[in-house]
Amino acid sequence: DFYQNVLLPPREAFQGSILFYEVCGCPDGETYAARMKKMAEHGFFDGIAGLLLGKPLGGRRAAALYDRITLQVLAELGLSHIPVVSNATFGHNSPAGIIPIGAMAELDGDNGRFSILEAAVE
């Protein structure tokens, strides 16, 4: 099971963190919803400060679909309190932004903003 992979950090590492997830690898909304539910089952959303979703392939229609599914699944799981910013440009899309893992960041779900608050390198 991928979600129990020893290469992934322990779930405690996610406490207070912003979880970023690249949705471009999901072939359809049904698969995406199933993956989100599986991630929740394995504790990925426990105690996170926010969820940052990458821009899906398929343009605005795909983005609207994944937004709707995300909010629906979070509501079903009793996780509507988690702020979400979607359609972010990181990972395997264009333009490809880089997110420095471990850097202090801020996610504002109400205004759709994600900000990195400190230098990624010294």
Where are these regions (language model features)?
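Accessory alpha-helical/coil subdomains and C-terminal extensions
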Residues: D1-D28
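C-terminal active-site/capping subdomain that shapes the small-molecule cofactor and substrate pocket
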Residues: P27-E122
